[in-house]
Amino acid sequence: MAQSFTGKKRIRKSFGRIPEAVQMPNLIEVQRSSYEQFLQRETRPGLRRDEGVEAVFKSVFPIKDFNERAVLEYVSYEFEEPKYDVEECIQRDMTFAAPLKVKLRLIVFETEEETGARSVKDIKEQDVYMGDIPLMTDKGTFIVNGTERVIVSQMHRSPGVFFDHDKGKTHASGKLLFAARVIPYRGSWLDFEFDAKDIVYVRIDRRRKLPATTFLYALGMDGEEILTTFYDVVPFEKRSGGWATPYKPERWRGVKPEFPLVDADTGEEVAPAGTKITARQAKKFADGGLKTLLLAPEALTGRYLARDAVNMATGEIYAEAGDELDVTSIQALADQGFSTIDVLDIDHVTVGAYMRNTLRVDKNAIREDALFDIYRVMRPGEPPTVEAAEAMFKSLFFDAERYDLSSVGRVKMNMRLEQDVSDEVRILRKEDVLAVLKVLVGLRDGRGEIDDIDNLGNRRVRSVGELLENQYRVGLLRMERAIKERMSSVDIDTVMPHDLINAKPAAAAVREFFGSSQLSQFMDQTNPLSEITHKRRLSALGPGGLTRERAGFEVRDVHPTHYGRICPIETPEGPNIGLINSLATHARVNKYGFIESPYRRVKDGKPQDEVVYMSAMEESKHVIAQSNIKVAEGEIVEDLVPGRINGEPTLLQKETVDLMDVSPRQVVSVAAALIPFLENDDANRALMGSNMQRQAVPLVQSDAPLVGTGMEAVVARDSGAVVIAKRTGVVEQIDGTRIVIRATEETDPARSGVDIYRMSKFQRSNQSTCINQRPLVKVGDRIVAGDIIADGPSTELGELALGRNALVAFMPWNGYNFEDSILISERIVRDDVFTSIHIEEFEVMARDTKLGPEEITRDIPNVGEEALRNLDEAGIVAIGAEVQPGDILVGKVTPKGESPMTPEEKLLRAIFGEKASDVRDTSLRLPPGVAGTIVDVRVFNRHGVDKDERALAIERAEIDRLGKDRDDEFAILNRNISGRLKELLIGKVALSGPKGLSRGEITAEGLAQVASGLWWQIALEDEKAMGELESLRRLFDENRKRLDRRFEDKVDKLQRGDELPPGVMKMVKVFVAVKRKLQPGDKMAGRHGNKGVISRILPIEDMPFLADGTHVDVVLNPLGVPSRMNVGQIFETHLGWACANLGKQITNLLEDWQQGGQKQALVERLTEIYGPDEELPDTEEGLVELARNLGKGVPIATPVFDGARMDDIEGHLEMAGVNKSGQSILFDGLTGEQFKRPVTVGYIYMLKLHHLVDDKIHARSIGPYSLVTQQPLGGKAQFGGQRFGEMEVWALEAYGAAYTLQEMLTVKSDDVAGRTKVYESIVRGDDTFEAGIPESFNVLVKEMRSLGLNVELENS
């Protein structure tokens, strides 16, 4: 297997046995592709598909004015370049967005007065600015007001038709009441439902119900048409001796006739009355030639007429369609000369009379009445007119502007109703309504199945593009009303398109969506995994989705169709469980929004290379085998293989299988696929494990896990945390902040031949963790496009590294690991093993106040020189300064209100001018609990405000950096082009040239005599070569101009003032890096849900140690394993132990070789570990680097559901030369004695979680009080106190601690006068106090008085 640049440096051995049939898709493709479909930025205007922005404009335009004198048409749109790039937007608190320009065409008509004919009078086209649309960064995020945000995809019920029943809950009898619901993408919902009496009703938008036939009348049907649509018609012909009817076997199966069946043609009795006719007999009668039955007249009683019985001559109606026949009415019809009576084929067993009964219940009989009824339900209180009712009914379901099923809805409807209608037809049709009612009635008759709404075939995903499209449509519709009004109010002949358009509503809708939608979330940026997971999240909440309170158990539960689409493990614990999910590793979203999973085709028991993606609906028709079935020589080995049909697990014959899974990890999400031995963990703990990995803090020095799953490199690559080479090339220059690579395979002359990659250094993430990138390459390295050239936070050598490998022993230690507590060695603190850096951001603004402008200055009243030691002349803290809580970061003074002055002050003021006392100190100080180093300061000035010295210094440094980038890129470009020019010139004949170059054939020596900048002056004899020289010259000049232009643009942006909030003159941001070592109270966890809090840090010498004197790092409680059933951690411990010991062996072999031993021993050991198929480095340098990187341990991958087995682990332990049981003899560090029995010791990958005790610990002496109750506020953020609640009061009462209780309830809480006095007495050195009345008592008295109860205190 070909290794990547970083993969060669440390090869990870995999235990996976199942080959991957398909490469894992890019993990943030969901976000990227959805937004690209929305914007279609790269597609030329004429070629754009009808989706996204294009679809929105086409649906809103053309806009006509009220008199139809003018039409505003949409032509096309294009995006301009964004004003600021991503970095600048983050620094300046701006939105990364591109201006949208739309080309509109205004057509003005004129009408001839005589003929009324319309002709085009004028056509005007113009580009109109329609606001800014935020752009997605390469990482799938949006920068909104300077913060990175993610738009989470939403799961909602797919548009279409759904059939369901009430599970017998509505009616006391437990009868199932069936219902059908037509859900459009936008528009009114249409419900059909049965009641307990089997009458079918219709509801529009969940309003009052009407008989379903009212809706059919409104569609233009009449009673007879309704009946013949829903029921077959059976003709009965009058003959002597009874009525004859055609014989159909299926109608008589299982029937016990009350009268004899007689063959109408022969007159002989076929079946006697009262005997049951079996299916075989019914078929036998037909085979015997029975075509017509003669039935007694009583056979017609209870049947329903199919058509009106009308006397054609007089028009008299004897009976109406749907009337029930009895003996008298049959006789009457016969007497009137009706020789044939058509009745409905209703037997009340297989076909019920529901629609006929509904028709009878319906009071309406004509269309107008039905329309009026619907109008009254939809708009109660308004008197209906025929036109209004007609228009309202049409707009509900048959108007494309108001009702949209969407292509998804039409496709779903076609599948459910077995129709074939184009997905362009997005409104309801009469046929759809009838088909829905037929299926509903069929369900009531026992035919067909109801739908499962939790099936992923009935739920779809709305990603970023679609969510924003809907929001933008809302904005444009708001704009449309304004445009119509403006078109009517202005002189249409002189106006231009941009005069009609105010783009604010559209821009506001987009801004509102990104700023305040429930689905637009502040990105979880704790580590690269949490970023990826956030982008792959699916939420059932949000606008148009579910709410936590209403979501039942079924919606949250795992469904068989989740297999390979949604992870069954990763979901939050708590109220959102099951409502927020994660996409499975291989899943993707198709054009209709359904989640698809990949499968390999299988033909005749042979797996094929072809991979197909299937949605839950398509998959239900297939027989699918698992990916772990044995395949030898391209054929499935076993005859019976495990698999599933329609989601149900079963054993399958290999010949029946037509699909198989592509990979065992396709079932789970990215986070769950990072847990080794996931198959050995209980699901609840696996859930915690996958959730806690997202909370791991990036450490100062990360280690990739010894025991991984092979997903680590994929996650690091796709997360955007590492730097990836865009093009193949050679590393030219490198330092800690940037890498310069010269592209070697670039053919496009318009593109630069140089790539400069800037490292992020100590940047603050959304969660205040530290983003820091480190180069992995050195000058001269050859890089291939796609290689990882720099590590980011929580990555090491291009692999995800969330924590560190720690030497762990499972044993109790003096009670310090009670209840999951963790005992750690002081070595971990000393060597900064779990030390992390957190960057806090503080900002201060100088505003223009009513009393005068605030000022950022070093000159602060009543502050000593000691407090100003870290500030520069401008009053801003210096970078690199060590700061403690309470230190001044930025000095600021605010003007005070004028107070009356004494005569002395007036005199002094007159003598010395302005005095310092009319300003107060409002400096930015470091809050309690934060101490660290200043890593960055940014100063922002308003336009037209003079920059201070500090702002100018920052600006100069930035310009120098940009200049260096430009110069380096130019130097490489110059070298590159000079090389090509030299190749072109050597061997050619020069006609003329610069001074120092002789005519004739050009040689390398001759060229060396002339400066390369003058080579352009050479004139060649060969015209073709001269043409090439000219094109090279042009390329060189263009590239130089491009570099200069880019540099000038950037400098111009720097020197221009910043856009600050209103009233702000200047803003300073200070970034403080805080180093957090591990300490008691910090939370740690493994990857298997094994979490705990550090209880004690023990001196190294007191920790238990191994026979070779190595002290363990961590002691965990063995009782944490059995009840929690996460045995994966024990497997990990054993395998980690084997890996580490193999690493020691390799280090020893490397040392032997470097001290004159044999290289072969090392190579043989590596081959034994990795197997003969693994490519080892072919150079000695590469081999040494690999061996050094393996010194800490040989990293292995044990993929989920396809990992190392018991015998693999034992084999590795043997190979590593340690006990096969994985247990070791340990000695007590305190006494030096051996423990009684062997202890499980090994390496576990431990994470430090973002629940640090430093962020939680908090103390208050005096602080802010609540306005009404005068009690201290609560919480660390408010600098609040600790609540002394009801139960705590009981405790003090129980102990009889009266004085303590009194001071808790009065002077320490809300006795305002008392607490002031206590403060004064403490200052005087007096320790007595007197308690007064708590303020909350006064609040209670006021409350009671507001209820009219007078409560007064009587002093007795």
From Swiss-Prot:
UniProt-listed SUPFAM superfamilies: beta and beta-prime subunits of DNA dependent RNA-polymerase
Family matches, as PROSITE patterns: RNA_POL_BETA
Pfam families given in the database record: RNA_pol_Rpb2_1 (PF04563), RNA_pol_Rpb2_2 (PF04561), RNA_pol_Rpb2_3 (PF04565), RNA_pol_Rpb2_45 (PF10385), RNA_pol_Rpb2_6 (PF00562), RNA_pol_Rpb2_7 (PF04560)
UniProt gene name: rpoB
UniProt-recorded Gene Ontology molecular function terms: DNA binding; DNA-directed RNA polymerase activity; ribonucleoside binding
Record note on quaternary structure: The RNAP catalytic core consists of 2 alpha, 1 beta, 1 beta' and 1 omega subunit. When a sigma factor is associated with the core the holoenzyme is formed, which can initiate transcription.
Main enzyme class: transferase
GO biological process: DNA-templated transcription
Name of the protein: DNA-directed RNA polymerase subunit beta
Family, similarity comment: Belongs to the RNA polymerase beta chain family.
Cellular component GO terms, alphabetical: DNA-directed RNA polymerase complex
Described purpose of this protein according to its UniProt entry: DNA-dependent RNA polymerase catalyzes the transcription of DNA into RNA using the four ribonucleoside triphosphates as substrates.
Catalytic activity as recorded in UniProt: RNA(n) + a ribonucleoside 5'-triphosphate = RNA(n+1) + diphosphate
EC number, as in UniProt: 2.7.7.6
Species of the source: Caulobacter vibrioides (strain NA1000 / CB15N) (Caulobacter crescentus)
Keywords: DNA-directed RNA polymerase, Nucleotidyltransferase, Transcription, Transferase
